[in-house]
């Protein structure tokens, strides 16, 4: 069950990021820290 909760959380996070950020380009890196997640392209 923990796995499914983690997967659902990741899906929700990616959905929120997709709404807040432009479409990620190839080579995009998802940076995750204790308090923030953000996308860095490069």
Swiss-Prot record:
Induction: By bacterial infection (at protein level). Induced by Gram-positive bacteria M.luteus (at protein level). However, another study found the peptide was present in both immune challenged and unchallenged controls (at protein level). The keyword tRNA-binding does not apply. Disruption phenotype: Adult males infected with spores from F.oxysporum or F.verticillioides display reduced survival. It is found in: Secreted. Transmembrane segments: none annotated. Its main location: secreted. Coiled coil: none annotated. The keyword Secreted applies. GO terms for cellular component: extracellular region; extracellular space. Keywords: Amidation, Immunity, Innate immunity, Secreted, Signal. The modification Threonine amide is found at residue 41. Residues 1-20 form the signal peptide. Residues 21-26 form a propeptide. Hemolymph (at protein level). GO terms for biological process: antifungal humoral response; defense response; humoral immune response; innate immune response; response to bacterium. Peptide which plays a role in the humoral immune response to a subset of filamentous fungi, including F.oxysporum and F.verticillioides. 'Daisho' is the Japanese term for a matched pair of samurai swords, one short and one long, and refers to the role of the two Daisho peptides (Dso1 and Dso2) in defense against fungal infection. This is Daisho1. The gene is Dso1.
């Amino acid at each position: 069950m923990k796995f499914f909760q983690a997967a659902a959380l990741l899906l929700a996070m990616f959905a929120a990021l997709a709404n807040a950020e432009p479409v990620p380009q190839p080579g995009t890196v998802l940076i995750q820290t204790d308090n923030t997640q953000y996308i860095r392209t490069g």
